[in-house]
Amino acid sequence: MKTVILALALIVLASSTQADVIATIKKIDQSPFGRTLFDTIYLELQTGDPLDRLLSTLTDLEDRYVAEQKEDDAKNQEYQGACTVDISAFDKDLAESNRKKIELEARLEGQLYPQRSILEGLVAQKKAEVKGYQKDLDELDAQRAEEHEDFEEKVLEHQEATAIIAEARRLFADNIEHGSFIQKGKATKQTHKFTKEVASMIQKHFTTSAKKTAKFQHRKGYSKLFKAFATIASKVEQLADAGAVQKIIDLADELLAKIADSLSLLRFAEDKRVEAYKKSRNFIVISLNVAGSALANATSDLASLNDIIAQVEASLDTTEQRIENVSADRHDRFTQCEEAVQDYQDARAARTSDRDVVSQTIGLVNKELRTLREQLALRQQAGEEI
């Protein structure tokens, strides 16, 4: 009974093994390389030649696959080692460039830009100061020019009035001493009269002067005074004696003295104004020069700082461009290395597959030649498909 069971088990095992062999043959035949091997084996079987040479060729091919794989493994290891070195160099370069970029940005944002902002504010402040002092100076000069013009006008008016009164006094004085105004050979208490011609001349003098002084900007009272003198001149013929005329002359002298005093006070006040003007102007000029010097220094400092900023910004641009270029080079190199890995893996997988086909075929030829022969014959009968 045990013998029967053992025999049945061997039969089942043999059937199972036979099915596995057929499955292996079909699997090999599905690959182009396996089909080519089977075609070659089938031809060898048909000719009846020994399969030793074929087995030797297959064994050599298997050994060559192993050798090629070892060589490919070594090349891949060397290439990937170079990739690691290159990628590490790129990473080191990028790390250094990024460190430099951070330093440059920190210098710009933390130092140079704030300094520029401060200097720009200082320049703006000093410009405003210079502009303000210049405005004060211009206004002071304009005021001084206006004051001087007023002074000159007042002096001219005083001089005009002095000339008018002096001329009138001369006319009175000359005529009081002239024989035509005194009745000769009579006592001094006798009435003395001006001629109509002299009286008319004096009246005309004061009338013309009154009209002229009416245009004065400062001493408008002279016009009224000279009108009054013109009225007196119209009645000068009725003056009782030379004593009355002398009073007019004395009045003219008094007026001339007052005008002279007024002119002296006017000049004194002008001198004081000039003195005050010079002091004020000197103070403003000093302030203007100080502000101007500070502005020039601040402007120079700002220009120098802008040059430094431009250099740092240019260095930052160069660094950023380098980061971009190195990153692109790293990406390209990394892609090359990854593609090389994929090519290596694909080639290894293909070589392993072909080597397995060769190994399995050698096993079939050595151990399952009968089954292989039958399957190849069936394959040929079925239209070269097992």
Curated annotation (Swiss-Prot):
Coiled-coil stretches noted in the UniProt entry, renumbered to this chain = 51-154, 293-332
Biological function: Structural protein that crystallize inside the trichocyst matrix.
Question: Mind telling me which GO cellular component terms the entry cites?
Answer: trichocyst
The region annotated as signal peptide is: 1-19
Full protein name = Trichocyst matrix protein T2-A
> Which keywords appear in this protein's UniProt record, sorted alphabetically?
Coiled coil, Signal
Q: Which family does it belong to?
A: Belongs to the TMP family.
Subcellular location(s): the record lists: Trichocyst
* Annotated propeptide span(s): 20-48, 184-238
> To which species is this protein native?
Paramecium tetraurelia
